[in-house]
Protein backbone atom coordinates (compact mmCIF):
# COMPACT_ATOMS: atom_id res chain seq x y z
CA UNK A 1 0.00 0.00 0.00
CA UNK A 2 2.77 2.45 0.92
CA UNK A 3 4.52 1.72 -2.39
CA UNK A 4 1.26 2.02 -4.32
CA UNK A 5 0.42 5.45 -2.87
CA UNK A 6 3.97 6.72 -2.34
CA UNK A 7 3.68 7.10 1.44
CA UNK A 8 6.62 6.89 3.82
CA UNK A 9 6.34 4.03 6.29
CA UNK A 10 6.60 6.41 9.24
CA UNK A 11 3.78 8.52 7.82
CA UNK A 12 1.54 5.52 7.37
CA UNK A 13 2.48 4.14 10.81
CA UNK A 14 0.59 7.09 12.30
CA UNK A 15 -2.63 5.48 11.06
CA UNK A 16 -2.52 2.76 13.73
CA UNK A 17 -1.29 5.26 16.33
CA UNK A 18 -4.25 7.57 15.69
CA UNK A 19 -6.69 4.66 15.93
CA UNK A 20 -5.12 3.50 19.22
CA UNK A 21 -5.15 7.00 20.73
CA UNK A 22 -8.79 7.48 19.76
CA UNK A 23 -9.66 4.17 21.43
CA UNK A 24 -7.81 5.23 24.57
CA UNK A 25 -9.50 8.65 24.62
CA UNK A 26 -12.98 7.17 24.14
CA UNK A 27 -12.62 4.36 26.71
CA UNK A 28 -14.05 6.27 29.73
CA UNK A 29 -17.04 7.48 27.71
CA UNK A 30 -17.72 4.06 26.19
CA UNK A 31 -17.53 2.52 29.66
CA UNK A 32 -20.33 4.81 30.84
CA UNK A 33 -22.42 4.05 27.76
CA UNK A 34 -21.97 0.29 28.22
CA UNK A 35 -23.31 0.56 31.78
CA UNK A 36 -26.63 1.97 30.56
CA UNK A 37 -29.80 0.09 29.48
CA UNK A 38 -29.24 1.18 25.88
CA UNK A 39 -25.91 -0.67 25.70
CA UNK A 40 -27.23 -3.07 23.04
CA UNK A 41 -28.24 -0.25 20.69
CA UNK A 42 -24.87 1.46 21.21
CA UNK A 43 -23.06 -1.80 20.45
CA UNK A 44 -25.00 -2.23 17.19
CA UNK A 45 -24.25 1.36 16.13
CA UNK A 46 -20.54 0.96 16.93
CA UNK A 47 -20.38 -2.35 15.07
CA UNK A 48 -21.99 -0.86 11.96
CA UNK A 49 -19.75 2.22 12.17
CA UNK A 50 -16.64 0.07 12.53
CA UNK A 51 -17.52 -2.04 9.47
CA UNK A 52 -18.31 1.01 7.34
CA UNK A 53 -15.09 2.74 8.42
CA UNK A 54 -13.04 -0.26 7.26
CA UNK A 55 -14.91 -0.12 3.95
CA UNK A 56 -14.06 3.59 3.65
CA UNK A 57 -10.34 2.78 3.79
CA UNK A 58 -10.74 1.50 0.22
CA UNK A 59 -11.48 5.05 -1.02
CA UNK A 60 -8.58 6.79 0.76
CA UNK A 61 -5.74 8.13 -1.39
CA UNK A 62 -3.97 10.65 0.87
CA UNK A 63 -2.54 10.38 4.37
CA UNK A 64 -5.06 12.88 5.87
CA UNK A 65 -7.88 10.70 4.53
CA UNK A 66 -6.34 7.64 6.17
CA UNK A 67 -5.88 9.56 9.43
CA UNK A 68 -9.53 10.68 9.54
CA UNK A 69 -10.73 7.15 8.75
CA UNK A 70 -8.40 5.72 11.42
CA UNK A 71 -9.89 8.11 13.99
CA UNK A 72 -13.37 6.87 13.05
CA UNK A 73 -12.23 3.25 13.37
CA UNK A 74 -10.73 3.94 16.80
CA UNK A 75 -13.97 5.63 17.89
CA UNK A 76 -16.25 2.79 16.81
CA UNK A 77 -13.84 -0.04 17.66
CA UNK A 78 -13.70 1.10 21.27
CA UNK A 79 -17.43 0.46 21.51
CA UNK A 80 -17.45 -2.83 19.63
CA UNK A 81 -14.48 -4.85 20.92
CA UNK A 82 -12.80 -5.30 24.31
CA UNK A 83 -14.96 -3.12 26.57
CA UNK A 84 -18.37 -4.48 25.51
CA UNK A 85 -17.03 -8.05 25.41
CA UNK A 86 -15.72 -7.84 28.99
CA UNK A 87 -18.93 -6.12 30.16
CA UNK A 88 -21.12 -8.81 28.60
CA UNK A 89 -19.07 -11.63 30.11
CA UNK A 90 -19.18 -9.96 33.53
CA UNK A 91 -22.97 -9.54 33.28
CA UNK A 92 -23.65 -13.07 32.09
CA UNK A 93 -21.28 -15.14 34.24
CA UNK A 94 -21.05 -15.31 38.02
CA UNK A 95 -19.05 -18.53 37.80
CA UNK A 96 -16.28 -19.41 35.33
CA UNK A 97 -15.88 -15.74 34.41
CA UNK A 98 -12.12 -16.03 34.04
CA UNK A 99 -12.40 -19.10 31.83
CA UNK A 100 -15.02 -17.50 29.57
CA UNK A 101 -12.90 -14.35 29.26
CA UNK A 102 -9.97 -16.56 28.29
CA UNK A 103 -12.06 -18.39 25.68
CA UNK A 104 -13.07 -15.04 24.18
CA UNK A 105 -9.42 -14.00 23.96
CA UNK A 106 -8.44 -17.38 22.48
CA UNK A 107 -11.18 -16.94 19.89
CA UNK A 108 -9.64 -13.69 18.73
CA UNK A 109 -6.21 -15.34 18.48
CA UNK A 110 -7.54 -18.27 16.45
CA UNK A 111 -9.54 -15.91 14.24
CA UNK A 112 -6.43 -13.85 13.56
CA UNK A 113 -4.43 -16.98 12.76
CA UNK A 114 -7.03 -18.17 10.24
CA UNK A 115 -7.87 -14.83 8.65
CA UNK A 116 -4.34 -13.40 8.30
CA UNK A 117 -3.28 -15.66 5.40
CA UNK A 118 -6.68 -15.25 3.72
CA UNK A 119 -6.42 -11.47 3.85
CA UNK A 120 -2.79 -11.63 2.71
CA UNK A 121 -3.75 -13.70 -0.31
CA UNK A 122 -6.61 -11.32 -1.14
CA UNK A 123 -4.24 -8.34 -1.07
CA UNK A 124 -1.78 -10.16 -3.32
CA UNK A 125 -4.40 -11.28 -5.84
CA UNK A 126 -7.06 -8.53 -5.76
CA UNK A 127 -5.30 -5.52 -4.26
CA UNK A 128 -5.65 -3.69 -0.94
CA UNK A 129 -8.67 -1.58 -1.96
CA UNK A 130 -10.75 -4.65 -2.84
CA UNK A 131 -9.60 -6.35 0.38
CA UNK A 132 -10.75 -3.46 2.59
CA UNK A 133 -14.15 -3.56 0.87
CA UNK A 134 -14.39 -7.33 1.29
CA UNK A 135 -13.44 -7.18 4.98
CA UNK A 136 -15.89 -4.35 5.67
CA UNK A 137 -18.82 -6.02 3.91
CA UNK A 138 -18.09 -9.47 5.38
CA UNK A 139 -17.99 -8.08 8.92
CA UNK A 140 -21.17 -6.11 8.32
CA UNK A 141 -23.07 -9.11 6.94
CA UNK A 142 -21.92 -11.57 9.63
CA UNK A 143 -21.34 -9.60 12.83
CA UNK A 144 -24.18 -7.07 12.82
CA UNK A 145 -26.98 -9.70 12.54
CA UNK A 146 -25.28 -11.75 15.28
CA UNK A 147 -25.19 -8.74 17.60
CA UNK A 148 -28.80 -7.87 16.78
CA UNK A 149 -30.20 -11.37 17.23
CA UNK A 150 -27.97 -13.03 19.82
CA UNK A 151 -26.37 -10.43 22.09
CA UNK A 152 -28.26 -8.96 25.06
CA UNK A 153 -26.89 -6.71 27.80
CA UNK A 154 -28.00 -8.83 30.76
CA UNK A 155 -29.61 -12.26 31.31
CA UNK A 156 -32.71 -10.47 32.62
CA UNK A 157 -33.27 -9.08 29.12
CA UNK A 158 -33.89 -12.68 28.02
CA UNK A 159 -35.79 -13.73 31.14
CA UNK A 160 -33.00 -15.81 32.61
CA UNK A 161 -30.19 -15.56 35.19
CA UNK A 162 -26.43 -15.27 34.97
CA UNK A 163 -24.51 -18.54 34.95
CA UNK A 164 -23.80 -19.47 38.56
CA UNK A 165 -26.43 -17.13 40.05
CA UNK A 166 -28.66 -20.04 41.10
CA UNK A 167 -25.83 -21.67 43.02
CA UNK A 168 -25.21 -18.44 44.94
CA UNK A 169 -28.87 -18.36 45.90
CA UNK A 170 -28.87 -22.00 47.01
CA UNK A 171 -25.90 -21.56 49.32
CA UNK A 172 -27.56 -18.57 50.95
CA UNK A 173 -24.38 -16.55 50.87
CA UNK A 174 -21.31 -16.36 48.72
CA UNK A 175 -17.93 -17.42 50.00
CA UNK A 176 -15.83 -14.64 51.44
CA UNK A 177 -13.48 -14.72 48.50
CA UNK A 178 -16.42 -14.23 46.15
CA UNK A 179 -18.11 -11.33 47.94
CA UNK A 180 -18.28 -8.17 45.92
CA UNK A 181 -17.40 -4.65 46.93
CA UNK A 182 -19.59 -3.02 44.24
CA UNK A 183 -18.13 0.44 44.78
CA UNK A 184 -18.91 3.20 42.27
CA UNK A 185 -16.28 4.88 40.11
CA UNK A 186 -16.93 8.22 41.80
CA UNK A 187 -16.29 6.73 45.24
CA UNK A 188 -13.30 4.57 44.34
CA UNK A 189 -11.45 7.38 42.55
CA UNK A 190 -11.00 8.98 45.98
CA UNK A 191 -9.06 5.98 47.28
CA UNK A 192 -5.26 5.63 46.80
CA UNK A 193 -5.64 1.88 46.25
CA UNK A 194 -7.58 2.54 43.04
CA UNK A 195 -4.72 4.54 41.57
CA UNK A 196 -2.30 1.80 42.62
CA UNK A 197 -4.53 -0.60 40.69
CA UNK A 198 -4.57 1.73 37.66
CA UNK A 199 -0.78 1.92 37.75
CA UNK A 200 -0.54 -1.87 38.08
CA UNK A 201 -2.75 -2.40 35.01
CA UNK A 202 -0.83 0.28 33.10
CA UNK A 203 2.41 -1.57 33.85
CA UNK A 204 0.86 -4.83 32.63
CA UNK A 205 0.34 -3.26 29.22
CA UNK A 206 3.60 -1.28 29.19
CA UNK A 207 5.69 -4.37 30.00
CA UNK A 208 3.61 -6.53 27.64
CA UNK A 209 5.06 -4.40 24.83
CA UNK A 210 8.16 -6.62 25.04
CA UNK A 211 6.33 -8.78 22.50
CA UNK A 212 7.06 -6.12 19.86
CA UNK A 213 10.81 -6.44 20.48
CA UNK A 214 11.33 -10.17 21.07
CA UNK A 215 11.93 -11.15 17.41
CA UNK A 216 14.51 -8.36 17.06
CA UNK A 217 16.22 -9.40 20.31
CA UNK A 218 16.38 -13.03 19.15
CA UNK A 219 18.10 -11.98 15.91
CA UNK A 220 20.34 -9.61 17.88
CA UNK A 221 21.44 -12.62 19.93
CA UNK A 222 22.80 -14.20 16.74
CA UNK A 223 19.91 -16.36 15.57
CA UNK A 224 18.52 -16.45 12.03
CA UNK A 225 15.33 -14.70 10.98
CA UNK A 226 13.65 -18.09 10.57
CA UNK A 227 14.52 -18.98 14.17
CA UNK A 228 13.03 -15.71 15.42
CA UNK A 229 9.84 -16.44 13.46
CA UNK A 230 9.69 -19.99 14.86
CA UNK A 231 10.09 -18.72 18.42
CA UNK A 232 7.30 -16.18 17.87
CA UNK A 233 5.05 -18.93 16.51
CA UNK A 234 5.88 -21.11 19.51
CA UNK A 235 4.93 -18.61 22.20
CA UNK A 236 1.83 -17.48 20.30
CA UNK A 237 0.73 -21.12 20.02
CA UNK A 238 1.37 -21.75 23.73
CA UNK A 239 -0.64 -18.62 24.56
CA UNK A 240 -3.81 -20.34 23.29
CA UNK A 241 -3.96 -22.97 26.08
CA UNK A 242 -2.12 -20.49 28.31
CA UNK A 243 -5.11 -18.15 28.35
CA UNK A 244 -7.40 -21.03 29.30
CA UNK A 245 -5.06 -22.08 32.11
CA UNK A 246 -4.85 -18.54 33.49
CA UNK A 247 -8.64 -18.12 33.32
CA UNK A 248 -9.12 -21.43 35.15
CA UNK A 249 -6.70 -20.37 37.90
CA UNK A 250 -8.62 -17.12 38.43
CA UNK A 251 -11.88 -19.09 38.71
CA UNK A 252 -10.60 -22.02 40.77
CA UNK A 253 -8.11 -20.37 43.10
CA UNK A 254 -9.08 -16.69 43.10
CA UNK A 255 -7.72 -13.32 42.04
CA UNK A 256 -4.58 -13.46 44.17
CA UNK A 257 -3.51 -16.83 42.74
CA UNK A 258 -4.18 -15.65 39.19
CA UNK A 259 -2.06 -12.53 39.68
CA UNK A 260 0.82 -14.52 41.16
CA UNK A 261 0.76 -17.22 38.47
CA UNK A 262 0.48 -14.95 35.44
CA UNK A 263 2.94 -12.34 36.66
CA UNK A 264 5.48 -14.95 37.79
CA UNK A 265 5.42 -16.59 34.35
CA UNK A 266 5.93 -13.19 32.75
CA UNK A 267 8.76 -12.23 35.13
CA UNK A 268 10.64 -15.50 34.55
CA UNK A 269 10.26 -15.18 30.76
CA UNK A 270 11.82 -11.72 30.85
CA UNK A 271 14.72 -13.02 32.96
CA UNK A 272 15.25 -15.75 30.35
CA UNK A 273 15.44 -13.07 27.64
CA UNK A 274 18.68 -11.87 29.21
CA UNK A 275 20.27 -15.29 28.58
CA UNK A 276 18.79 -16.25 25.18
CA UNK A 277 22.25 -16.51 23.59
CA UNK A 278 22.20 -19.92 25.31
CA UNK A 279 19.67 -21.92 23.28
CA UNK A 280 17.95 -23.72 26.21
CA UNK A 281 16.98 -20.32 27.65
CA UNK A 282 15.61 -19.27 24.26
CA UNK A 283 13.07 -22.10 24.22
CA UNK A 284 12.38 -21.83 27.95
CA UNK A 285 11.64 -18.14 27.40
CA UNK A 286 9.17 -18.99 24.62
CA UNK A 287 7.31 -21.47 26.83
CA UNK A 288 7.17 -19.15 29.85
CA UNK A 289 6.25 -16.13 27.72
CA UNK A 290 3.44 -18.14 26.12
CA UNK A 291 1.83 -18.25 29.57
CA UNK A 292 3.06 -14.86 30.80
CA UNK A 293 1.85 -12.83 27.83
CA UNK A 294 -1.73 -13.87 28.65
CA UNK A 295 -1.85 -11.33 31.48
CA UNK A 296 -2.05 -8.61 28.83
CA UNK A 297 -5.51 -9.71 27.68
CA UNK A 298 -7.03 -11.80 30.47
CA UNK A 299 -5.91 -10.27 33.78
CA UNK A 300 -7.17 -6.67 33.72
CA UNK A 301 -10.88 -7.38 33.07
CA UNK A 302 -10.99 -10.36 35.44
CA UNK A 303 -9.14 -8.58 38.26
CA UNK A 304 -11.30 -5.46 37.84
CA UNK A 305 -14.51 -7.39 38.49
CA UNK A 306 -12.81 -9.43 41.22
CA UNK A 307 -11.70 -6.33 43.13
CA UNK A 308 -14.47 -3.80 42.50
CA UNK A 309 -17.47 -6.04 41.82
CA UNK A 310 -19.88 -6.23 38.91
CA UNK A 311 -22.43 -3.52 39.68
CA UNK A 312 -20.33 -0.62 38.33
CA UNK A 313 -17.97 -2.76 36.26
CA UNK A 314 -18.59 -1.14 32.87
CA UNK A 315 -17.93 2.37 34.12
CA UNK A 316 -14.83 1.42 36.10
CA UNK A 317 -13.32 -0.77 33.38
CA UNK A 318 -14.03 1.84 30.72
CA UNK A 319 -12.21 4.50 32.74
CA UNK A 320 -9.37 2.10 33.51
CA UNK A 321 -8.87 1.13 29.84
CA UNK A 322 -7.53 4.58 29.01
CA UNK A 323 -4.32 4.01 30.97
CA UNK A 324 -3.20 0.55 29.73
CA UNK A 325 -3.71 1.75 26.15
CA UNK A 326 -1.28 4.59 26.76
CA UNK A 327 1.07 2.24 28.61
CA UNK A 328 1.27 -0.16 25.68
CA UNK A 329 1.76 2.68 23.20
CA UNK A 330 4.74 3.94 25.22
CA UNK A 331 6.21 0.57 26.21
CA UNK A 332 7.49 -0.50 22.80
CA UNK A 333 9.25 2.78 21.91
CA UNK A 334 10.84 2.99 25.39
CA UNK A 335 12.24 -0.54 25.12
CA UNK A 336 13.58 0.24 21.64
CA UNK A 337 15.09 3.48 22.95
CA UNK A 338 16.92 1.57 25.69
CA UNK A 339 18.44 -0.61 22.97
CA UNK A 340 19.44 2.42 20.90
CA UNK A 341 21.16 4.01 23.91
CA UNK A 342 23.02 0.92 25.13
CA UNK A 343 23.33 -1.30 22.05
CA UNK A 344 21.76 -4.17 23.98
CA UNK A 345 18.31 -5.24 25.15
CA UNK A 346 19.60 -6.49 28.51
CA UNK A 347 19.14 -3.17 30.34
CA UNK A 348 15.58 -2.99 29.00
CA UNK A 349 14.85 -6.55 30.16
CA UNK A 350 16.19 -5.81 33.64
CA UNK A 351 13.98 -2.71 33.88
CA UNK A 352 10.94 -4.64 32.60
CA UNK A 353 11.58 -7.43 35.13
CA UNK A 354 11.77 -4.86 37.95
CA UNK A 355 8.56 -3.20 36.75
CA UNK A 356 6.81 -6.58 36.68
CA UNK A 357 7.60 -6.95 40.39
CA UNK A 358 6.24 -3.45 41.05
CA UNK A 359 3.03 -4.14 39.10
CA UNK A 360 2.51 -7.39 41.01
CA UNK A 361 2.89 -5.55 44.32
CA UNK A 362 0.39 -2.86 43.26
CA UNK A 363 -2.19 -5.41 42.12
CA UNK A 364 -1.87 -7.55 45.26
CA UNK A 365 -2.08 -4.45 47.45
CA UNK A 366 -5.25 -3.31 45.67
CA UNK A 367 -6.82 -6.73 46.09
CA UNK A 368 -5.97 -6.87 49.81
CA UNK A 369 -7.43 -3.41 50.44
CA UNK A 370 -10.63 -4.36 48.60
CA UNK A 371 -11.08 -7.36 50.94
CA UNK A 372 -10.69 -5.04 53.94
CA UNK A 373 -13.27 -2.65 52.46
CA UNK A 374 -15.72 -5.52 51.94
CA UNK A 375 -15.39 -6.54 55.59
CA UNK A 376 -15.97 -2.96 56.71
CA UNK A 377 -18.98 -2.72 54.39
CA UNK A 378 -20.44 -5.91 55.87
CA UNK A 379 -19.88 -4.71 59.45
CA UNK A 380 -21.64 -1.43 58.65
CA UNK A 381 -24.57 -3.32 57.11
CA UNK A 382 -24.81 -5.61 60.15
CA UNK A 383 -24.82 -2.65 62.55
CA UNK A 384 -27.54 -0.94 60.52
CA UNK A 385 -29.59 -4.14 60.52
CA UNK A 386 -29.24 -4.56 64.29
CA UNK A 387 -30.21 -0.93 64.86
CA UNK A 388 -33.41 -1.39 62.83
CA UNK A 389 -34.31 -4.47 64.87
Pin down the residues of each PLM region.
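Intracellular juxtamembrane helix-capping segments at the cytosolic ends
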Residues: 79-93, 295-308
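A late C-terminal transmembrane helix in Major Facilitator Superfamily
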Residues: 112, 307-342
Amino acid sequence: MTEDLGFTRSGYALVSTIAALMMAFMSPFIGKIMSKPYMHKALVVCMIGNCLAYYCYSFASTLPQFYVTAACIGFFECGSTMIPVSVLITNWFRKKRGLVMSIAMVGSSIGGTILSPIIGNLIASQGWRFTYKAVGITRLVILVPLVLLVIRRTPADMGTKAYGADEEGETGKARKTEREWNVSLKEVKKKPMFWCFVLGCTLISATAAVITQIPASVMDAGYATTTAASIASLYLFIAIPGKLVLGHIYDRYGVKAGILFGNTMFFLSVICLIFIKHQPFLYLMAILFGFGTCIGTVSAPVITSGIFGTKHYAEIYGFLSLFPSVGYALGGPLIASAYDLTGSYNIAWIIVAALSIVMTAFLLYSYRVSRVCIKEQEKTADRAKNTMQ
